[in-house]
Amino acid sequence: FPTPVAGIPIRAFDASAERLLKMGFRLAVADQVEPAEEAEGLVRREVTQLLTPGTLTQEALLPREANYLAAIATGDGWGLAFLDVSTGEFKGTLLKSKSALYDELFRHRPAEVLLAPELRENEAFVAEFRKRFPVMLSEAPFEPQGEGPLALRRAQGALLAYARATQGGALSVRPFRLYDPGAFVRLPEASLKALEVFEPLRGQDTLFGVLDETRTAPGRRLLQAWLRHPLLERGPLEARLDRVERF
């Protein structure tokens, strides 16, 4: 079947790719893989990159905040896992309700989401999900990997399979980290919106924008993570304050 292709000058690639990704396209980049003088007929080209919103590693295309790919599976609860391919951050949690799932998704704001087959086939769920989260929905095999509850292992497997497929097999990922949302102040979606933590209700100012004096991309992402997950326990709070006092 015919496949639309486009030639983009190499100097304009980043700007063109960014625009196409924002329009909802997945990009397959085909590069010349043999010298033109050695070619017999057409110069051979192969797909060398697959670009999707949640699997970017190119600095010029990455947003300033964490760029999460998320996967959701069901079973013994709602298994939710996140992977930032650009940094290797890999974490997840098991949730008891759909409302808790939506709160975690809103806090992390993934760029792309993988849905398990039982969710993709649920038209009511997909319609509700798209209304709440206007992000790219993609497919991957949900073969269990790692340890823990089945739903969470399925989500882990989907993230790794999809990331490897888009990165051509080359993938550097940190060990999976199980996190407990109960260790942090619970900030539901409505509270984050009302407090204008990341998105303004009026004007342009947000809490994050006022506090953001970071100098590096990792520092900016860390500040975002702290605001998304305020600490509850006294020990970690005092340790963080001690580190800040040194400056």
Feature-to-residue mapping (PLM):
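Charged catalytic and DNA/RNA-contacting regions of genome-maintenance
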Residues: 1-247
